[in-house]
Structures are given as C-alpha cells and as structure tokens.
Amino acid sequence: MITSRLFLLTLTVLSCVPTQARPVIATVYHEWYEGRPDYCGGIYRDNKVSAAHPWLPCGTQVNVEYKGRSLVVPITDRCECDSIDLSYRAAKILGVPVDGIARVHIHY
C-alpha cells in the first residue's frame, strides 16, 4: 500500500516537471517516401505534419522549435541516430531547409 502511494506521488511530481528543450539534428523526408507505409501503421504524406524519431512512442506529440518558430508534430515513424526527420510540410512551416539539415530543439 505504501509502495503504491509512493509510486503515485513520484508520478505526480515528475509530471509537474517542465520538459527541457533538447537540441537535435533535423532532416527532411525525401520525396521518395510519399505514399509508403510508416512504422506506426499509417501512410507517409508530404502534405501532412508528422515526424520520425528513433525511440519516442508512436503518437507522441513533440514540440519542434527552429529560429523562433514552433510546431507540434506527431511521431509516426522511426529514424536512425539521435535525430528527428520532419515531413516536408512540417519543415516548410518551421522554415527548416527542405534540402538540408538543421539544428532544432524538441520538447516531449
């Protein structure tokens, strides 16, 4: 009983801690992926806001910041390394170069 109360108290305290901005490298999906299945069971579309991450669970809402712009994107796929791959639309909204890479900050 005490253990479960301590566990719930710990969860409550941790859920009140603000997330920290974490710098990562952002890349943009290549147009080749258009219409292909993603890891989370959907179909990748260039015109949808989405992202891939190496270990965050499917459906996690991630706030991505780049040069003063901010956008919440759902994780719908997996990618390699410790980075984030943005859909074409997400990159355009944020101003991330669609033919290169950029350092962004993510909150999750």
Describe the residue ranges of each PLM region.
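Bacterial N-terminal signal peptides
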Residues: 5-15
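Secreted/periplasmic proteins
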Residues: 16-108
